[in-house]
Structure formats: structure tokens, C-alpha cells
Amino acid sequence: MIAGTRGSRLALVQTNHVIEMLSEVCKEKIEKKIIKTKGDRIRDSQLYSMDSRGLFTRELDMAVLNEEVDLAVHSLKDVPSDLDPDLAIAAVPPRESPAEVLVSRLDWEDLPQGSKLGTSSLRREAFCNHHQKNFKMEPLRGNIDTRIRKVMDGEVHATIMAEAGLKRLGLEEHIKRRFPVEYFTPAAGQGALAVITRADSELISSIGRITHHPSLQEVTAEKTLLRELGAGCQCPLGVIGRATGNQLTLYAVLLTREGEMLRKVTVRGPLAEAEDIGKKAAKEMEDYI
């Protein structure tokens, strides 16, 4: 069995984690194949200034469809909401923290007005503006190590990152502040992984054994909301699903780039009805997109 992956340190750690889990449920030996994506090649553009759908996944998905690899491991937030019908999300392992964190030498309240905040995320820019942080936004792309180095070297004063990536790489010492998800709401699927296969693959049932169903239902609701709204990186939308027992709560926030609150919704329902919960939240937000 061959697993396709991007070549970054984080992608390899994530793929190795999935391979370890699969090795406990599959007898086949699994090898990695590194595939470079368009997002890996383009480093000088803001994500929201281009069509970002499949930016970090398309080449891997094509390798799956062309049977060059048997599966691909993605950060679920990068997976398009309208996945190719010939592909399937075969597994969603247990989700890591979906939270956003501050990486900086100074804490959130101590960053002065005019501080340079590095980000290429319209959502993160909007949430900073919403909290009346008069930062100077600086484009910041690159892998996790590169972004941390630019903060530590003083090229920017701070950046906002996904806690999951830092934890997976053992870089928690760089976290200055962990934000509550209601204060700085993450991207859909943040912290989760997706194992992609062909929709007709015989491997789906065995790979699916590593799925963590509460995590799957959380991200299903989040991604359904995005799909129904047709929202992507060009839309400053934060959304988080939280499973508690057999119940699911979906919380979503839509801002303008300047940080004005357009709509905030909370929808609750049975965990098994995650897609319907996402659709209901989208219905409550559709007039504001």
C-alpha cells in the first residue's frame, strides 16, 4: 500500500501518525510517496487572493485517482468541501486541538498598536480587527518552522497559528497564548486529518476502522456549512463543531475583513445529524455572505 503525502515536516509527521494507526488494523506494509502540490510551489501570494480550493490537495488527489498511490493524508481543513465524487474520505482519526494560538515574544494584551502581525489568512486578519487590534498585517507564508523563525527574528512581531500543528511537531514552547474557540474561531476542519481513497477502493472498510466518529461528525457539520455557503479562504468565516456525548453543537461566526460582526449562529442537535446541523447553520447565515 502506498500513502501519498506532501513533503513538509508536518505533513510527514501526520502521515506517519496515520500509517502507525493503520498498521494496527491493516496487514499490508505501507510506504510513503512524497508529492509536491501547487500550494508548496507558490509561496509569494496571499491565500485569499487566489483560488485556494485544492491548493494543497489537488496533486495528491490526482495521484489517488490515477492509482499512483492508494491513499492520501490531508489536513482536513485543506480538503475542498465539494470533494471529487470519485474520491472518498475513508477515515478521520481522532482530532487534535482545533484552537488558534498566538506565537510571539509578547502576550496578546502587550502587543502595541501598529505591531506587525504575519498572516496570509483573511479570517485571522478579520478576527484581529474584530478584537480592535490595530495591527499592521504582513503577508506570511511558509511552513511552521519558517513562520516561527520570522517571529523570533523580529521580521514580524506575532503570528496566529493552529495549535494542532505546533503540538504535532513538539513546538508547544512557542505558544504564548491559546485562544478560546469562541474568541478566535478556527477554520472548518482545523486540527483534523482526512485519509482520502478512491470511492470504489476495497480499502475503505479497513481504513475506516481508524475513524473517530465524534471527530468525523464535528468536521462533517463544519464542512457542510462551508459547502452550503460556497465559502472558502476568501470569506472570513470561523466555525467549530463540538461533540458532547450524543449531542453536537456548531458555532459559526462571519465577519467583514475589517472585523465587523455580520452573523453569529449556534445550532445544536443529535450527533448523528451533523450534516443537517451544518445545513441549518448555513440557512441562518446565507443572507450575509
Curated annotation (Swiss-Prot):
Q: Which residues carry this modification: S-(dipyrrolylmethanemethyl)cysteine?
A: 233
- Cofactor(s) essential for the protein: dipyrromethane
Q: In which pathway does it act?
A: Porphyrin-containing compound metabolism; protoporphyrin-IX biosynthesis; coproporphyrinogen-III from 5-aminolevulinate: step 2/4
- Can you quote the record's cofactor note? Binds 1 dipyrromethane group covalently.
EC annotation? 2.5.1.61
What's the family? Answer: Belongs to the HMBS family.
This chain's function reads: Tetrapolymerization of the monopyrrole PBG into the hydroxymethylbilane pre-uroporphyrinogen in several discrete steps.
Q: What is this protein called?
A: Probable porphobilinogen deaminase
Q: Which organism is it from?
A: Methanothermobacter thermautotrophicus (strain ATCC 29096 / DSM 1053 / JCM 10044 / NBRC 100330 / Delta H)
